[in-house]
Amino acid sequence: GHSELLWVVGDARQFNAEGAVPTNATARDILRADDENGWHSAEAIRRMARLAALLHDLGKASQAFQQRLKGERNERNLIRHEWVSLRLFLAFVGEDGDRQWLERLSDETDANEACWTDPARYLCDKPGSGPGSATPPPFASLLQQAPLAAAIGWLVVTHHRLPAAPPASSATNRRWGDKRGCFEKNWLTDPLTAIACEWNEVISNPQTPPKDFDPYWRMAGPLPVAAHAWRKQAARVARHLLKLQQPQPFDWLNNIWVLHLARLCLMLADHHYSSLGMDGEGRPVAARQPFVQSQQKLFANTVFDRTGRRQPCQSLLEHLLGVSDSAAQISHALPGFERHLPRLA
């Protein structure tokens, strides 16, 4: 039965109207309100990392990458998959401002699949392959046109490594990361505008025939953007990013703190989810189960089976969905993670 409060012996201020009283007290933040309220940029970090994760490996849909997974292509990459991912995303953005492309992405009923590979929008770099082969640097016009798209594109193209100025074209045995030998002032004043394909991967042979680049830009099958599961997640993130643009857009591209942590979340999520393989019965481990997609022909990675042979592991669609979810979880945990870091104070 229930008791009725008649009188209080002691300090009545310690009791509520029903006679309940706390039996203990703590200075710890049990409700963890500080986690949610102290990080004003946490929402932007989470949403940007999540959208970049949905985009980061789209370039793995290329014929060249799928052939490499099957062991049919062993030469050094001419174009890395993250650069193809960037170009695919920018083809979707087109000439729109941030609000326009986010509104298109927020409509999960419209796949907009054609615009991702429309020849008029999908610019395919073929560096050093002859006159007229150069394509405009991706960030040159994007910085003013759609700064949020530029920030997302930066996360996509840097999820493995940061751009590096390529060695001089006259150098022999050119490799990515070799010393440039000179420095240009605009790299400090406008660091993104000059970034081109060879900042991501150097073409060792400047005489590479144009046809050799084609498998890197031609898709081996439908992009994951055509799948409802992908569009649903992308639309959800796009709607949140649209809200962050209210009442006026914020310059996230120049917020180094946000970009650095969003990139950290994306890279950690990518490494984590890529490490998830099969259980002892040859089935996807439990952590993968919510994201496994059936009837997929494009894959993101491989795994050794029990006989020591390489087999397809995560489908490309599964990988994008899983990494996006992991990036969201990691970014959500950042405020709590901070408390466990060593500090001077």
Language-model segments: residues:
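Auxiliary, metal-adjacent structural segments of Zn-dependent hydrolase domains
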Residues: H2-E18
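Accessory nucleic-acid engagement/destabilization modules that flank
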Residues: G1-H2, D11, T23-S326
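Walker A/P-loop
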Residues: R343-A345
